[in-house]
């Protein structure tokens, strides 16, 4: 009981804040006022965006009892989410068949989750904090930087001017996970607004459903808080905020032996200032500044990894709308990162006796000017052409061109095309933190920062029928790498090799989406995606990227009764097969049969369901995840070679070869409390 006290205190503070909020509004009769809201189906393709953009709104984020940002993609076909390893609980995503490191993450158009915050950062953005998530495929605007290769994921938080001055959410999972979220907004004056966001979660029990002696999920405790502010007058708008994260997670063998102990601390502060230069708002200037500090300490058995990061990002933007048809945005941005890293693998007695590993410092600096021209003819045709001149310390100058076309030949048809270049500096260990959950030796320069270079192009056609709410969408996108860091598990069974790309590397992705409302209050989303992703591996040639599923299909159904008093959500997902590592081909299950005939994972289904009952001011919900109870067998490889807790880790030990669910069936229940503004 003592372990749950911090969460209980947070819940008490949340309810106290609700009372204070209600008193501060000075309403005459709050209970007599009814607020009618529209609960949308939860996700849709944006008609107005130039890029092919999927929007998951607040209703979509409520379809599951989760959730953080990673879990919100569980029922999405565009984004695949999985585990980086079976020990730390780190989540990773894939877009267009490629790792999430090639997808730029934004918080209200401000770059986030790069560097040390990336491996666990998807769990640091609670779903109840968000208004929506926008998933854009292809090459986005040059204004946000050169880093995007496969697309952008932008999150919109609840605003200081929110119509919901208080929101509280608490949920409990059958695996003992407790999750509490609070959002409280307040108008301090007609010009000054603020919102406070709080989150706490913890796992209190050990689970080993596959009986391999390892925790299926780490015991974790996370606290997360943000304070966001807005000052607004006609002459200027200022937004600023601060946030902090504390995350502790322990995994590995139960009762001792090989264990992981991860401690992550993060501080962030940002400032956004915007000023109109004309009364009609046709010209404006804005400045964005962001600072992040991360501290990551990880113990992997006897191995130790420590990382410290200081990051600064600044962007000066000028926009001028010359006429209704012509718009020009120019500016200059700068990004600076300093990393202090040390790594001691602890795989041999010599590693242990040599003492702490030396700290290696690296400073990454890049930036430059950019310009973006927009030409549009009403809603019929849009052209966006952008160019960045990016300078990288140690590498030199690069041009980053991008172009987007949107054409609406008829009211019911929208065509889009997009192409552009993306650049990013690789962070070998941070980008692939799962390599630390192995006993394999590292071969190559795993602390260098190679400049990765890729070109992405593609298009989308969306046909609307039987009104604005029904559509069929088809899209294709292709990414080609000119330079890439390859992390190769298969060159040698007991080593992981890091080396530059020595041939082709590409991903082709096809996707079809059908959204329909067959009858009132019933919506259906059917999505299918096929991916062909291959890379050249040293000594093996061009091969399919391992552990990356080639197919995913999702069917999402929702039905609401009148006045949305009852909401029923059901999602079925079919996950295609993936190529396994060569050293996994001969693995056998408990029945003696090969686990991966033909060297591929099985096709498996997953089911999710939730029932929500809405009352005045609060909702109750109960649901289930992974109702098929499908789990990956033999998640931890080589652990049977560990005869006692004192022996060193075998070289064949690998906890990073994860392609499917680790946890089985989960049941959840929760409550949402909402206080609306009344006038």
Task: Enumerate the predicted regions with their spans.
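N-terminal periplasmic "start-of-domain" segments of outer-membrane beta-barrel proteins
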Residues: 28, 33-64, 92, 100, ...
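Short acidic/polar hinge/loop motifs at secondary-structure boundaries
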Residues: 92, 110-137, 225
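Flexible loop and strand-edge segments within Gram-negative outer membrane beta-barrel domains
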Residues: 203-224, 230-282, 291-309
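Membrane-embedded beta-barrel scaffold of Gram-negative outer-membrane proteins
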Residues: 284-298, 408, 414-416, 448-506
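Gram-negative outer-membrane beta-barrel transporters
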Residues: 376-380, 476-480, 500-585, 672-679
């Amino acid at each position: 009981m003592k372990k749950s006290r911090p969460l209980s205190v947070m819940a008490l503070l949340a309810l106290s804040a609700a009372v204070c909020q209600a008193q501060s509004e000075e309403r005459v009769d709050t209970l007599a006022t009814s607020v009618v809201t529209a609960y949308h189906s939860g996700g849709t393709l944006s008609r107005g965006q130039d890029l092919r953009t999927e929007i998951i709104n607040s209703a979509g984020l409520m379809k599951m009892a989760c959730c953080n940002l990673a879990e919100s993609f569980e029922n999405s076909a565009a984004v695949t989410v999985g585990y980086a390893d079976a020990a730390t609980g780190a989540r990773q995503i894939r877009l267009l068949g490629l790792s999430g490191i090639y997808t730029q993450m934004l918080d209200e158009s401000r770059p986030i989750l790069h560097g040390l915050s990336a491996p666990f950062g998807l769990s640091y953005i609670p779903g109840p904090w968000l208004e929506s998530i926008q998933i854009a495929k292809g090459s986005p605007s040059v204004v946000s930087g050169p880093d995007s290769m496969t697309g952008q994921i932008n999150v919109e938080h609840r605003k200081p001017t929110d119509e919901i001055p208080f929101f509280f959410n608490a949920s409990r999972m059958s695996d003992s996970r407790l999750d509490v979220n609070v959002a409280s907004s307040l108008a301090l004056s007609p010009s000054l607004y603020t919102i406070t966001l709080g989150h706490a979660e913890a796992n209190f029990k050990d689970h080993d459903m596959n009986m391999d002696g390892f925790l299926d999920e780490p015991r974790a405790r996370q606290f997360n808080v943000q304070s966001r502010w807005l000052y607004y007058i006609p002459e200027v708008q200022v937004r600023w905020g601060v946030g902090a994260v504390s995350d502790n997670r322990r995994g590995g063998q139960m009762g001792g032996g090989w264990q992981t102990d991860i401690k992550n601390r993060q501080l962030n502060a940002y400032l956004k200032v915007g000023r109109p230069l004309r009364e009609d708002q046709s010209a404006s200037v804005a400045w964005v500044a962001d600072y992040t500090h991360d501290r990551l300490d990880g113990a992997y058995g006897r191995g130790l990894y420590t990382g410290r990061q200081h990051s600064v990002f600044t962007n000066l933007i000028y926009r001028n709308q010359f006429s209704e048809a012509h718009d020009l945005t120019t500016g200059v941005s700068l990004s600076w990162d300093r990393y202090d890293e040390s790594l001691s693998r602890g795989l041999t007695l010599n590693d242990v006796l040599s003492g702490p590993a030396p700290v290696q410092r690296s400073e990454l600096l890049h930036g430059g000017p950019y310009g973006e021209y927009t030409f549009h003819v009403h809603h019929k045709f849009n052209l966006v052409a952008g160019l960045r001149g990016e300078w990288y310390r140690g590498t030199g100058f690069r041009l980053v061109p991008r172009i987007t076309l949107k054409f609406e030949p008829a009211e019911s048809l929208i065509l889009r095309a997009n192409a552009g270049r993306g650049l990013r500096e690789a962070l070998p260990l941070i980008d692939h933190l799962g390599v630390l959950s192995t006993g394999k030796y590292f071969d190559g320069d795993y602390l260098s920062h190679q400049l990765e270079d890729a070109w992405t192009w593609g298009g989308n056609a969306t046909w609307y029928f039987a009104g604005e709410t029904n559509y069929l969408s088809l899209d294709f996108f292709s990414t080609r790498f000119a330079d890439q860091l390859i992390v190769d598990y298969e060159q040698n069974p007991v080593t992981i090799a890091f080396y530059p790309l020595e041939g082709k590397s590409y991903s082709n992705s096809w996707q079809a989406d059908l959204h329909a409302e067959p009858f009132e209050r019933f919506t259906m989303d059917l999505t299918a995606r096929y991916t062909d992703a291959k890379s050249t591996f040293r000594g093996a040639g061009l091969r399919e990227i391992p552990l990356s599923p080639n197919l995913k299909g999702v069917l999402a159904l929702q039905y609401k009764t009148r006045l949305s008093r009852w909401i029923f959500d059901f999602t079925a997902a079919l996950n295609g097969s993936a190529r396994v590592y060569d050293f996994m081909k001969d693995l056998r299950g408990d029945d003696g049969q090969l686990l991966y005939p033909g060297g591929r994972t099985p096709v498996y289904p997953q089911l999710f369901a939730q029932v929500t009952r809405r009352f005045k001011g609060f909702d109750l919900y109960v649901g289930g995840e992974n109702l098929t109870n499908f789990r990956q067998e033999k998640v931890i490889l080589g652990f049977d070679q560990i005869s006692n807790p004192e022996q060193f880790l075998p070289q064949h030990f690998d906890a990073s070869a994860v392609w499917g669910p680790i946890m089985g069936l989960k049941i959840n229940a929760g409550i949402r409390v909402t206080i609306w503004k009344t006038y």
